[in-house]
């Protein structure tokens, strides 16, 4: 049931972002990368809280290391999008930062209550990001090696999230 809700919420959010950023690729990518870091920060926050409460599981250290690495990688993507003018407009920064604020706290609660479902949502988002970059490369700029590298990173993140879902059965 939660996976169905994840899919519907994701589809709705994607349709809004697609409409707002039609034809503005790097602004859209910047918003997506700004948002992409939020779940990993949320996961780390909850893992730290669980550790402080004595609720550490055997997978705890591995997950913390993976999520920290993912935040750094997503930050590199964000910086690339900034270098391409993705954050040039105040309205885009305003929209993304407010969306991140909401998304972060939703992920904190979601991860605390249902880590597998939280991972599933992030997994679906990473797959969407990979697909978004693949379409850009196919239809807009097939020679952008940085976008190609970012697309591969998104695929790797999706695989890591899938492994995390399996790990915490």
Annotate the PLM regions.
Residues 1-169:
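Non-heme di-metal
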């Amino acid at each position: 049931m939660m996976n169905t809700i994840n899919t519907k919420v994701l589809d709705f959010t994607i349709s809004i972002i697609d409409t707002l950023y039609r034809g503005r690729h790097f602004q859209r990518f910047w918003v997506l990368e700004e948002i992409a870091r939020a779940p990993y920060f949320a996961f780390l926050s909850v893992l730290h809280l669980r550790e402080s409460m004595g609720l550490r599981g055997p997978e705890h250290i591995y997950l913390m290391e993976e999520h920290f690495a993912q935040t750094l990688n997503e930050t590199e993507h964000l910086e690339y999008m900034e270098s391409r003018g993705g954050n040039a407009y105040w309205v885009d920064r305003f929209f993304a930062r407010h969306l991140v604020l909401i998304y972060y706290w939703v992920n904190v609660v979601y991860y605390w209550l249902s880590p597998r479902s939280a991972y599933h949502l992030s997994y679906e988002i990473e797959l969407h990001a990979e697909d978004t970059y693949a379409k850009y490369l196919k239809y807009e700029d097939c020679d952008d090696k940085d976008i190609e590298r970012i697309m591969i990173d998104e695929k790797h993140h999706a695989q890591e999230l899938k492994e995390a879902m399996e790990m915490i059965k």
